[in-house]
């Protein structure tokens, strides 16, 4: 994350960092297990088509190249570090896809200091959970065991006690969507069976299920 933020330079002020690479920044429990390492960094940009493509040109000028080995159309690679960078638009018509909670992620982002003079805009924990649940619904295919999106959500539920209060203060539409997604999980017998294997500490499965139940009401 830091290598991408530094490579972007002042361009980073225009994007909001999202996705699995920021999960560790949203964990507030000092005793929580480390989150999974990711191969790439995600960011979203609020811009029209012309501005988005101009921003892509600026990214290329900062030492990034399109990852021609990937079929992910938003993927870049930082040539010096080799770190992958997915730059996504908020508006779905620009690249043909988006996430319905990206606008909320941009609206509620906050600055966070990574140290050594590097500051980024970080999505909120509520936006993280909402976007990840949306992604799981779209590409997860109900595969609990192999979904990094679901794993990321469970890590935040486990490692951020204040998430309950944050969700309670979220917009009604988002709160209802998240609650519905959690309700579908808790009533799924297969999910209950595999939950201990999805988290770093299987002994916390009951606590996580309890929190999921409370969020789904």
What are the residue ranges of the model-derived segments?
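Compositionally biased terminal segments of proteins
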Residues: 1-217
């Amino acid at each position: 994350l830091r290598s991408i933020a530094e490579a972007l330079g002042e361009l980073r002020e225009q994007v909001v960092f999202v996705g699995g690479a920021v999960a560790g920044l949203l964990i507030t429990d000092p005793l929580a297990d480390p989150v999974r390492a990711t191969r790439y960094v995600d960011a979203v940009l609020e811009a029209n088509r012309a501005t988005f493509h101009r921003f892509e040109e600026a990214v290329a000028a900062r030492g990034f190249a399109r990852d021609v080995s990937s079929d992910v159309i938003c993927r870049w690679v930082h040539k010096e570090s080799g770190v992958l960078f997915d730059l996504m638009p908020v508006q779905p018509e620009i690249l043909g896809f988006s996430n319905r909670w990206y606008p909320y992620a941009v609206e509620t982002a906050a600055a966070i200091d990574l140290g050594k003079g590097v500051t980024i805009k970080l999505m909120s924990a509520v936006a993280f959970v909402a976007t990840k649940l949306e992604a799981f619904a779209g590409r997860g295919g109900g595969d609990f065991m192999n979904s990094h999106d679901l794993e990321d959500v469970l890590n935040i539920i486990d490692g951020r006690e204040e998430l309950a209060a944050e969700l309670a203060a979220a917009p009604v539409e988002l709160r209802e969507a998240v609650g519905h997604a959690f309700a579908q999980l808790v009533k799924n017998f297969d999910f209950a069976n595999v939950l201990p294997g999805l988290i770093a500490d299987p002994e916390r499965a009951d606590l996580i299920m309890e929190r999921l139940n409370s969020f789904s009401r």
